[in-house]
């Protein structure tokens, strides 16, 4: 079943989106605004495990891709890594939209997420979307130094060639900005 954009926009009229690059301040800003204005906060990253449990490898292959080691994960080409990252986000989006429709039926919701400009325009009016963009020069160290991303940083540091893994992540995150 496919829903037209105008239908999704109507059902998401109580949802405001804060999106953008990693380390751009999305979580900090969305939490502060949700608290200040009494909005329900929906953090897409916090829902990933829940959505993954509901996913099906046939329909959400990127969400269900497993890597045996940091070397396998970070050893992919930048193009492979970027495509996996974008596909992962796209596959989770269906779960996110349904959650947002349910949550926003009778209240305002602020969604901390990863949308492209095209997705944002398809699902919402421009006045309800904020993009926070960070200079991509060294995202991996900033990302890894955050308390909520220590697991990722430890995984990265378990790679055989840590500097190459960091470079792959930085380039991938930079190239994924093009899709924002």
PLM regions: where:
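Walker A/P-loop
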Residues: 27
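Hydrophobic anchor at the beta1->P-loop junction of P-loop NTPases
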Residues: 18
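ATP-dependent small-molecule kinase phosphotransfer cores
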Residues: 50-108, 114-115
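ATP-dependent NMP and nucleoside kinases share a basic, alpha-helical "lid"
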Residues: 111-155
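Short beta-strand-centered segment that lines the nucleotide-binding/catalytic pocket of NTP-utilizing
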Residues: 39-54
């Amino acid at each position: 079943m496919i829903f037209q954009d105008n239908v999704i926009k109507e059902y998401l009229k109580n949802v405001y989106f804060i999106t953008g690059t990693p380390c751009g301040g999305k979580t900090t800003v969305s939490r502060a605004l949700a608290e200040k204005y009494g909005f329900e906060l929906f953090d897409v990253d916090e829902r990933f495990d829940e959505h993954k449990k509901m996913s099906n490898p046939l329909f959400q292959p990127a969400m269900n891709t497993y890597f045996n080691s940091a070397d396998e994960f970070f050893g992919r080409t930048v193009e492979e890594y970027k495509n996996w990252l974008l596909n992962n986000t796209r596959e989770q989006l269906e779960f996110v939209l349904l959650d947002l429709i349910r949550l926003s039926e009778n209240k305002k919701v602020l969604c901390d997420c990863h949308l492209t400009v095209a997705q944002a325009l398809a699902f919402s009016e421009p006045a309800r979307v904020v993009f926070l963009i960070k200079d991509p020069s060294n995202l991996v160290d900033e990302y890894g130094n955050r308390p909520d991303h220590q697991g990722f940083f430890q995984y990265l540091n378990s790679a055989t060639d840590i500097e190459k893994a960091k470079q792959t992540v930085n380039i991938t995150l930079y190239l994924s900005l093009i899709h924002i």
